[in-house]
């Protein structure tokens, strides 16, 4: 035979083959049929068990036998895939109503593997037989199996809407399905209402089918998500564990979880909660125990004595599978194609299937009844001429001759003649004659009823309704899942996530930051802080791990850093550079740092630039959830930079000090609260080539200390300052010299807690007591404290 060779491109061949493969996967493996809610392997398992008599009213049989039957006759795939599907049909935490009963280890909600199929035994559940009922009455179409040795059903009769009741999940090429299980009684009631009112709306249907009913129970939140899913096939709800509070003898409390979301692995959930406890991501949990036994699921979360149980519960909802989002994606095979279907479409498809099934069954029953009627009429006729019939049979040569004689002599049909010659003598009693008459009457009534069903659509629907009601009455169970209309907002107190602890925060001039335990700080002392050469401590203060640090830079940006996210480093060790926490520019410098507890509206920040701009922004504006990048707090122009930030609880005086010795004092109530991206307004009217060196808050108990580039230090009393209006030039605080004039390089407001100063020159650090610096008059240049000829010009100063 000559070969046929086709010249095809690889792209076409691959595309064609993958298309065929995808079609097979979609239709024959991963997606359920909308009519019976089963995937092919599930259908084959149930049919194989039914065909072999492995039904609910019989003894259990080895699972391996069923797997062998399925593989040998219907499903030529690996035994593990068949056994896995069989096991799932028996798991009451996966299916709302199991379709297979299994003895032995059939896995667990912890995702433990089942015992090998040679150890477990199984049989059909009572409900699954309602899927297969009347399958032998030509109710559904059969097709040849994979090797044409037998037939298998394309779909099961399915006397109840299994797709909705048990749901389905699967992934195929380009398609996925997630249909949740529902309550049997609700689904059947909704179907009955649809039969009575085909134009019923989703809102009306949801009075009966309220929403999913998961086998693991739980609380379903989001009625709008359910409605959207029922309308479109896609929707989203929140599924939350059922958690109750239980007192302990010790005075402590524990949270008891008795129901978890559908498809959640219990052991993984327990492990996750315990990891959150061990990693100190949540404060207040003492112990997590899995106390599940044969009486039911139970997870105990023991809490500390004063723990906020509600906040801990909310934290676990958000950070573990104690609460999940369930996404409806109701895709099923309808008329041979995958289709996204809403609730009405699914019910309509099921009802159309039932109409076809009941019609086929009725035709079959009618045909059988008419055949039996024909036989009964023949027997009755024979009994009416019994003597003649007996004589004819006795005179016949054999069975065939007797049948032929009956047909020829008395006009019996072939079927009637067969029944007559097979009639046993004891059936000729008067009792059996009466029984035939009674059977004839019953058959007449049955045939009339069956013909009425076929001729009358309303009668056919009535049959479907009666059968659905029968199943509802027989298998009705209470709802397990509770439905709540709204999705609860999860509010988590910071105290739950972060243990409250007082620590020492430190920040250096070069941007090294750390938090240190009070024990390490007290053991070392301030002066023993770990620093790089040339670096110095900018600020240190006691803060709480539940606080937030705002680090301000010279580029008008700030870093939002929760204290608990800072590395816990010993006082004597070098801190972590700020750029390792939040990336900043190489030329970006830290100008100040503040600790925020609650970002309350009354507090505000004053931000001042070198070129004399100033702004005021409420503390609440600085709160954010973004920690990974610097955020803008002031729009700073080119060749300008932020020099200081001051946090105030209420309006008060601020003093501005310039390089050329000018000072302006005014109230912050002259500044309006502006957004973080604003550039601000003019603070002081600067002279040419002058710039701001200090902007700080001041009150009548303070003094001002300043140092010039020539090494002179001057301290003035608050009374020297004169309150004025913003944007003025201010007063002069230095005596102007024609030769080598003094220029202020640093200034600070002396508060009650300040006792020492440190002045930094190019080659020297000068330490001194503030009390040793006497108050000066307005128009003086102060006293020299550093010989700049020896140590270079002064650059900066800090107070401690």
Curated annotation (Swiss-Prot):
Site for Interaction with DNA, residues: 39, 75, 77, 88, 94
GO cellular component terms attached to this protein's record: chromosome; cytoplasm; DNA topoisomerase type II (double strand cut, ATP-hydrolyzing) complex; extrinsic component of plasma membrane
Record keyword Membrane present: yes
Gene3D superfamilies tied to this protein: 3.30.1360.40, DNA gyrase/topoisomerase IV, subunit A, C-terminal, Topoisomerase II, domain 5, Topoisomerase, domain 3
EC number(s) recorded for this UniProt protein: 5.6.2.2
Catalytic-site annotation from UniProt: 119 (o-(5'-phospho-dna)-tyrosine intermediate)
Pfam family, one: DNA_gyraseA_C
Gene Ontology MF terms in the entry: ATP binding; DNA binding; DNA negative supercoiling activity
Location, primary (coarse class): membrane
Keyword terms of this UniProt record: Cell membrane, DNA-binding, Isomerase, Membrane, Topoisomerase
Any one GO BP annotation for this protein: DNA topological change
Feature type site, description Transition state stabilizer: 118
Keyword Cell membrane assigned: yes
Membrane topology designation: Peripheral membrane protein
Protein family (similarity comment): Belongs to the type II topoisomerase GyrA/ParC subunit family. ParC type 2 subfamily.
Quaternary structure and interacting proteins, as annotated: Heterotetramer composed of ParC and ParE.
Protein name according to UniProt: DNA topoisomerase 4 subunit A
Lineage, opening ranks: Bacteria, Bacillati, Bacillota, Bacilli, Bacillales
Gene it is expressed from: parC
């Amino acid at each position: 035979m000559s070969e046929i060779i086709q010249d095809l491109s690889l792209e076409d061949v691959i595309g064609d083959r993958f298309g065929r493969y995808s079609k097979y996967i979609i239709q024959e493996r991963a997606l359920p049929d909308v009519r019976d809610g089963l995937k092919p392997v599930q259908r084959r398992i149930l049919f194989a068990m039914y065909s072999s008599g492995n039904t609910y009213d019989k003894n259990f049989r080895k699972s391996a036998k069923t797997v062998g039957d399925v593989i040998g006759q219907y499903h030529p795939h690996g035994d593990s895939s068949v056994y896995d599907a069989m096991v799932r049909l028996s798991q009451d935490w996966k299916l709302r109503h199991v379709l297979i009963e299994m003895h032995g280890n059939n896995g667990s909600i912890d995702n433990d593997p089942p015992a090998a199929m040679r150890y477990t035994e199984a049989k059909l559940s009572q409900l699954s037989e309602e899927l297969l009922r009347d399958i032998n009455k030509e109710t559904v179409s059969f097709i040849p199996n994979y090797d044409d040795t037998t037939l298998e059903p394309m779909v099961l009769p399915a006397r109840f809407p299994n797709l909705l009741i048990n749901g389905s999940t699967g992934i195929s090429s380009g398609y996925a399905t997630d249909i949740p299980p529902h309550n049997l009684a609700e689904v059947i009631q909704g179907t009955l209402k649809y039969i009575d009112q085909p134009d019923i709306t989703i809102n009306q249907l949801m009075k009966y089918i309220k929403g999913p009913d998961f086998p693991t129970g739980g609380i379903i939140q989001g009625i709008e998500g359910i409605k959207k899913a029922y309308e479109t096939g896609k929707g989203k709800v929140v599924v939350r564990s059922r958690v109750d509070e239980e007192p302990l003898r010790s005075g402590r409390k524990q949270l008891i979880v008795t129901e978890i979301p559908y498809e959640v692995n219990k052991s993984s959930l327990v492990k996750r909660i315990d990891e959150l406890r061990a990693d100190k991501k949540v404060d207040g949990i003492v112990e997590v125990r899995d106390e599940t036994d044969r009486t039911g699921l139970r997870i105990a979360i023991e809490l500390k004595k004063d723990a906020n149980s509600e906040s801990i519960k909310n934290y676990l909802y958000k950070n573990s599978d104690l609460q999940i989002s369930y996404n409806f994606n109701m895709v099923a095979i309808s008329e041979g194609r995958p289709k996204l279907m809403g609730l009405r479409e699914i019910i309509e498809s099921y009802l159309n299937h039932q109409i076809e099934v009941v019609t086929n069954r009725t035709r079959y029953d009618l045909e059988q009844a008419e055949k039996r009627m024909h036989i009964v009429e023949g027997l009755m006729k024979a009994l009416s001429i019994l003597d003649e019939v007996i004589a004819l049979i006795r005179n016949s040569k054999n069975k065939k001759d007797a049948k032929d004689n009956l047909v020829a002599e008395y006009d019996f049909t072939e079927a009637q003649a067969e029944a007559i010659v097979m009639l046993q003598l004891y059936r000729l009693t008067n009792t059996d004659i009466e029984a035939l008459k009674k059977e004839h009457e019953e058959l007449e009534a049955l045939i009339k009823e069956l013909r009425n069903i076929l001729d009358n659509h309303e009668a056919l629907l009535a049959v479907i309704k009666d059968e659905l009601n029968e199943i509802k009455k027989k298998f009705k169970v209470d709802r397990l899942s509770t439905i709540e209309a709204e999705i609860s907002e999860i509010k988590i107190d910071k105290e739950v996530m972060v243990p409250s602890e007082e620590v020492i925060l430190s920040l250096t001039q070069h941007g090294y930051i750390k938090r240190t335990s009070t024990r390490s700080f007290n053991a070392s002392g301030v002066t023993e802080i770990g620093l790089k050469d040339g670096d110095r401590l900018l600020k240190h203060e006691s803060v709480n791990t539940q606080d937030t640090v705002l680090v301000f830079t010279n580029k008008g940006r700030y870093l939002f850093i929760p204290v608990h996210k800072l590395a816990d480093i010993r006082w004597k060790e070098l801190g972590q550079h700020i750029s390792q926490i939040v990336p900043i520019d190489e030329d970006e410098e830290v100008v100040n740092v503040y600790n925020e507890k609650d970002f309350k509206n009354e507090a505000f920040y004053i931000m001042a630039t070198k070129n004399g701009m100033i702004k005021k922004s409420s503390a609440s504006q600085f709160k954010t959830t973004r920690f990974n990048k610097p955020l803008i707090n002031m729009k700073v122009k080119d060749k300008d930079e932020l020099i200081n930030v001051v946090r105030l609880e209420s309006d008060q005086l601020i003093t501005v000090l310039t390089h050329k010795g000018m000072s302006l004092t005014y109230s912050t109530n002259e500044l309006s609260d502006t957004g973080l991206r604003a550039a601000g307004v003019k603070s002081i009217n600067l002279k040419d080539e002058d710039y701001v060196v200090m902007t700080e808050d001041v009150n009548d108990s303070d003094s001002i200390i300043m140092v010039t580039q020539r090494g002179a230090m001057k301290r003035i009393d608050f009374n020297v300052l004169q309150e004025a209006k913003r944007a003025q030039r201010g007063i002069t605080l230095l005596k102007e010299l024609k030769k080598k004039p003094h220029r202020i390089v640093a200034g600070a407001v002396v508060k009650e807690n300040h006792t020492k100063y440190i002045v930094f020159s190019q080659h020297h650090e000068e330490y001194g007591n503030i009390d040793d610096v006497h108050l000066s008059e307005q128009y003086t240049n102060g006293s020299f404290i550093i010989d700049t000829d020896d140590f270079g010009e002064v650059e900066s100063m800090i107070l401690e």
